[in-house]
Design a protein with these regions (language model features):
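A glycine-rich, acidic short-motif signal
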Residues: 1-192
Length: 192
């Protein structure tokens, strides 16, 4: 599509400054779509590997928030992670991480899942990359925000967390670990 647009308009679309890729959640369940997406990203098309990938149940609802916002939606979303002191490393939420984990069977991809609160996008959960039960295919599985924090702590992507758990407050900071995590039916498993 990008190449056809370039040929039709006689101009080259520069995608190197794209900060965010927003994916519809249902696409994550489509193995063929995901395979095509990572193949495009790996084929030399100028899609920046460092763009942050967000997931939404309703991409249109998130995109339509731009009308009410004072700043660019893409910048707002990128800053939501990059400017957040809880995140030491956003590399697990990048397009490059998604591609690498898809091909190599890795499990470092942690994609934020967006919802809407007070007419602003908010992270309401995460999608974790994992290998399916057959051991052959990569899948992305949604977990709660709290489970995503645990996975982020285990991966080193999150360095500080403040959250409510069972009516109490937990504050963790300067966490350094070696890790391996998996999404399970009952939550997130983390081997430290």
């Amino acid at each position: 599509v990008i190449r056809r647009m370039d040929e039709k308009n006689g101009k080259i679309l520069d995608l190197n400054h794209v900060k965010v890729l927003l994916l519809e959640a249902e696409f994550l369940e489509e193995k063929d779509f995901m395979q095509e997406l990572v193949e495009i990203g790996n084929s030399g098309v100028d899609l920046p590997g460092n763009m942050i990938v967000f997931v939404a149940e309703d991409v249109d609802a998130i995109s339509n928030l731009q009308e009410e916002m004072d700043e660019d939606l893409g910048n707002y979303l990128a800053e939501m992670l990059e400017g957040n002191p809880n995140y030491e490393d956003t590399s697990g939420a990048t397009f490059k991480s998604l591609i690498c984990d898809w091909y190599n069977g890795g499990s470092s991809t942690i994609l934020p899942s967006l919802g809407v609160q007070d007419d602003l996008p908010v992270v309401e959960g995460y999608y974790l990359m994992q290998t399916d039960v057959s051991g052959d295919d990569q899948i992305l599985r949604k977990v709660t925000a709290e489970e995503g924090y645990v996975a982020g702590l285990c991966s080193g992507a999150i360095g500080m967390v403040d959250m409510d758990v069972d009516g109490g407050q937990i504050h963790l900071e300067n966490v350094k670990v070696s890790y391996e995590y998996t999404a399970t039916n009952s939550g997130v498993g983390c081997q430290l």
